[in-house]
Swiss-Prot record:
This is Photosystem II CP43 reaction center protein. Residues 1-14 form a propeptide. It comes from Crucihimalaya wallichii. GO terms for cellular component: chloroplast thylakoid membrane; photosystem II. The gene is psbC. It is a multi-pass membrane protein. The lineage of its organism: Eukaryota, Viridiplantae, Streptophyta, Embryophyta, Tracheophyta.
Length: 473
């Protein structure tokens, strides 16, 4: 009975809808998958599957290089990046390349170099993909056992997982080294309106870094998305890189424990579903980060966040009316609350009016005007700098609102420009992609579990109703 049970539980079934599984060939008869099922035809052809993945990487890197050069070719240094529909150059600028004080672009050559390097890399990957798809061995197990695998070989699968984790850890440390040793990164909080600087005082305190994970995801807490300190971002990459590398070594050296062998499904489609779930989580987190966070995604490059644009409008009109003689500390608005300033429920002085709901915004142009109890009235009267006025006026008219068909801005704002914020594009696209990846996870997880349990859902293609219907023409 024991043998029967373990066979039933772990018997290796790839989810084919018909046909038998054969090694040779990539057609429907030998694999059970039609041409449009793509890589499913290559489930047991490790060499060809390698070709497909390398070619896919080549396409990704080619897009990055081509789009990078396209943005460089269209870039106008006199306009902010976020007014030009750029999504790649802001990332390069955030890494400290080509920018100076205040986020001003002083050199576009690093951006050109980045584009060319990606194009060259994509050519190498493209060649490798075509080679392995067309010329290389169909399977790697015989000639290159280190790179070969069988999907149900749990030990080999966790070894591959370990290698991937180490590579991810190395990637995290690349950012750390850039910030510490290779020119630094752009810090929007640098005094006077942001600058590129090297990170000098990493505290590495686990209570600080992992404290973010324990925060509530709502309101003034904001979970990990609330990070507003460049040191903490780089420290986080030190911790995460270390965990990934040590976890990778652990998975290479160990075999899966009994509980893991029992709990997980060990098939190619199951691993696909796990990967899709992980990518989905990454997409949703990236969506929240680019929408709310103005430290990892500086507003100088990505435009203001929604709360930031709203608070900037309140600040701009406070500055204007104060110059015209208004007493901003006591003026009443139409609701009886303060017109310019009011108190939050916990007693801080905050901007009044509709923007009161964004009272917990932190932004580099605003923080110098705060005291121990919120906005400081004496600083608002005496200490406002011209750069703060300029920046808030700019952010006020560039709210990340509007539809993705380029009719942007606040509908009632007479000074609005035809503009859609990169934050709108990046957060929307990552939410949508994260959602579709999650649906893909559910789909492939369901199929993988059904196959592992010994039954499969689906139509037998030999008897599809469509085969007996009159052709459309």
């Amino acid at each position: 009975m024991k043998t029967l049970y373990s066979l039933r539980r772990f018997y290796h079934v790839e989810t084919l809808f018909n046909g038998t599984l054969a090694l040779a060939g990539r057609d429907q008869e030998t694999t059970g998958f039609a041409w449009w099922a793509g890589n499913a035809r290559l489930i047991n052809l490790s060499g060809k599957l390698l070709g497909a993945h390398v070619a896919h990487a080549g396409l990704i890197v080619f897009w990055a290089g081509a789009m990078n050069l396209f943005e460089v070719a269209h870039f106008v240094p006199e306009k902010p990046m976020y007014e030009q529909g750029l999504i790649l150059l802001p990332h390069l600028a955030t890494l400290g390349w080509g920018v100076g004080p205040g986020g001003e672009v002083i050199d576009t050559f690093p951006y050109f170099v980045s584009g060319v390097l990606h194009l060259i890399s994509s050519a190498v990957l493209g060649f490798g993909g075509i080679y392995h798809a067309l010329l290389g061995p169909e399977t790697l197990e015989e000639s290159f056992p280190f790179f070969g695998y069988v999907w149900k070989d749990r030990n080999k699968m966790t070894t591959i997982l370990g290698i991937h984790l180490i590579l991810l850890g190395v990637g995290a440390f690349l950012l750390v080294f850039k910030a510490l040793y290779f020119g630094g990164v752009y810090d929007t909080w640098a005094p006077g309106g942001g600058d590129v600087r090297k990170i000098t005082n990493l505290t590495l305190s686990p209570s600080v870094i992992f404290g973010y994970l324990l925060k509530s995801p709502f309101g003034g807490e904001g979970w990990i998305v609330s990070v507003d300190d460049l040191e903490d971002i780089i420290e986080g990459h030190v911790w995460l890189g270390s965990i990934c590398i040590f976890g990778g070594i652990w998975h290479i050296l160990t075999k899966p424990f009994a509980w893991a062998r029992r709990a997980l499904v060990w098939s190619g489609e199951a691993y696909l579903s796990y990967s899709l779930a992980a990518l989905s989580v990454c997409g949703f987190i990236a969506c929240c980060f680019v929408w709310f966070n103005n430290t990892a995604y500086p507003s100088e490059f990505y435009g203001p966040t929604g709360p930031e644009a709203s608070q900037a409008q309140a600040f701009t009109f406070l500055v204007r009316d104060q110059r015209l003689g208004a007493n901003v500390g006591s003026a009443q608005g139409p609701t009886g609350l303060g017109k310019y300033l009011m108190r939050s429920p916990t007693g801080e002085v905050i901007f009044g009016g509709e923007t009161m709901r964004f009272w917990d915004l932190r932004a580099p142009w605003l923080e110098p005007l705060r005291g121990p109890n919120g906005l400081d009235l004496s600083r608002l009267k005496k200490d406002i700098q011209p750069w703060q006025e300029r920046r808030s006026a700019e952010y006020m008219t560039h709210a990340p609102l509007g539809s993705l068909n380029s009719v942007g801005g606040v509908a009632t704002e007479i000074n609005a420009v035809n503009y859609v914020s990169p934050r709108s594009w990046l957060s929307t696209s990552h939410f949508v992609l994260g959602f579709f990846l999650f649906v893909g996870h559910l789909w492939h997880a369901g199929r993988a579990r059904a196959a592992a349990a010994g039954f499969e859902k689906g139509i037998d293609r030999d008897f599809e109703p469509v085969l007996s219907m009159t052709p459309l023409n």
